[in-house]
Amino acid sequence: SGVSGQSGLTLDLEAKVEIGELAYFDDGKGIALQGVRLSSAADPAQLAKYHLELDILAAGDLSLTFKSENVSRFEIEEIRFVDTPGLTPITSDPSIGGIFIDYDIEGSLLSYNRGNSYIGPNNVLGGVYDLEFTITNGKLGYRTNGNEFLLDGMTLDVSSLGMIFGVTPAGELNLSMPNLLAELSVEAIRFSSNPLNHGVSNDVTTGDPLASYGSLWVNMDLNTDLRIKAGGADGLTGM
């Protein structure tokens, strides 16, 4: 990575991340994300590259802009139900498959300087943010038993202005997005039964394009409010 600064701070980041397992447990039962990886999409052995710029504006607001320097891949190889964390996975253990996303992202996050007063209709102690980003050259895939379902040629535009994130007086974690706009387009919805194929548009054995179920376009304008309350590690409530 490289760091420079004059008007704010510029960070060029190159990363290859591998996490064996992340697990969440409640009442002695857990769900584990195994084989979590971040790398270049073209070659898993290569690095994902990003350019970040951080600046404090005149009003005291914090501005972060971010941009990919290559197409990156974030992958969870297996999602399993487990009793004990950290054990070597057995192929017969219950699994719901794995997911991955390839993306080239560019966007910005603005954190407003609002002091320590309560915010919004839920009287949250936290922050107000504007988030905007665009994903291009995207692929979103689900994989299980050598079969793969793929959203190919994905573009996603997201704008969430006036987003509130913090804690309510009742101790609930609150994420409020009163102005969430999103537009998703997918060039082809593909399926592969060849276990050698992974995140590709053409079959690696035959070279033929993978079967497509057509394209997809979605436009959303949402007002959402999410509150999460902790119910304890034991008992019926959980989270």
What is each model feature region?
Residues 12-239:
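Intrinsically disordered, low-complexity polar regions and short flexible loop motifs
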Residues 1-10:
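Low-complexity repetitive segments in secreted/extracellular proteins
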